[in-house]
C-alpha cells in the first residue's frame, strides 16, 4: 500500500507540473490548423533529444482536449475487444522562460473493452512480451492509462551548447472482469538526458541517452472459488502449458538502455533533421512472490532511423518524413530446480537459452503539400506509404509465423474561413487507404496442435495480419475564439473511419471519435 501511495503521489505531482506548464503558456492562441502547422515545423520536438528545443519555434502554446472514442467490429486481433470505448483527457503546453524552455504533457484514458479474449495476465499483450497467460473466455476489461511527460532545456550556452532532459512516467491499471480474472499494474519510468552543439547557423549536432525501468505486477484469481478455470501459459507461437485453477502470479521486471544521434541542417526556408537511435530492453518474468521462480525473459533490440524535411515558401510548404525501424526480440526460457536446503531455499536457475525469435521491420514515407495562409494553411494534400514485415520463429520444435504488408494512403484537408471575427474556422479532412498483403503464413510444429492457443489465438493473429483491406474516413472540426480580444480558441471535432475487408469472414471495424478542446 505504501508503494502504491508513493506512486500515486508521484502521479499527482507530475499532473500539477503538466497543468502548470499548460496554464502558464496560455498567452498565445491557435486555430486547429495553426496548431497543427506549429507542431509540424518543430522538428526537434519529434526527436529523442530535449536539448534541441532552442532550435525549434519557441513561441508559447497550450491545449486541453476532452475526448470519447468508440471502435466496433470483429476486424481486430483476438486479444483486442470487439468493442472498445475510451474516455480521455489530455493537456500539452510549451513555455519560453527566457533562461529555460519547458514542455509538459499529460494524458489520461479510461478504456472499456468488450469481448476481448486470450489474455488473462498483462495490460498490453502487444508490447513485445510473448510470455503471459491466456484463456478462452471472452471478457470485459476495465483499463486506466496515465501518461506524463516533460522536457526542459537550456538556451544556447556560449552560443554553441545546449543541455536538455526528458522524463516520462506511464502507469496502466487493467482488470479482467470474468474468471479467471486478473488485476495487473504496469509502470515505466524513464529519463533521457541530451546535449546539442551548434557549429553555425546551418549545422547542429545532438546526442542523447535513454534509460527506463519497467515493472508489471500481475495477480490472477477466481471470484467463484467453486469452479476451477482452464488457462494456458504461453511460450510463443502457440506453444503453451495448460493449467487449471485460479491462475498464477507473475512479476515482470525490466530495464531499457539506449542512445540517439541527431544532425540538423537549416536555412531560412529549409529545415532537415536526421536521427538514428538504438536501444536494448532486457525483461524477465517470475512466478510467485514468496518463492520466485524465473520462467522466461526477452532481449529486445530496436534500431530506428528517421529523416524529416520541411521547405517553406511564400505560398506553399512541403513536408516529408521517412522512417525505418528494425526490431529483434529473443525469447529466453529458463530451467530451474527447487532447492529446499537451509542455505538456499527456493528455486535455483540451472540453464537458459533462446527458444524463439521475433523480427519486425517497418518503413514509412509521409509527404504533405500545404497552401500557406498566415500561421495556418488553407488546404493540405497528404500521401502516406507504409511497409511492414514480420518474421517470427519458435526454434524447437519449429513453428513459424510471418506476414508482409504494403499500404498506401491519400488524404486532403480544407480549412474554410467562416468569418474573420472570432477567427471562425471549419476544417474538413477526408482520407482513404488501401492495404495489400504480400504474403504470410502460420505453421505450427509443436505438440498439442489442438490447443486453442494454436487454432484460435495464433491463427487469428495470422488472419488479421494477412488481410487485404481498405479504409475510408474523415473528420470535421469547428473552431472559434472565445472573445474578440482573447486568443483562446475553442473547437469541436468529429472523426469517423471505416475499415472493410472480405477476408476470413471479417465484417470490418468502425471508429467514431468526438472531442472538445481549446488551444491557447
Predicted segments with their positions:
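Outer-envelope beta-barrel architecture signal
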Residues: 58-62, 98-104, 159-163, 201-205, ...
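Long, internal scaffold/assembly segments composed of regular secondary structure
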Residues: 239-383
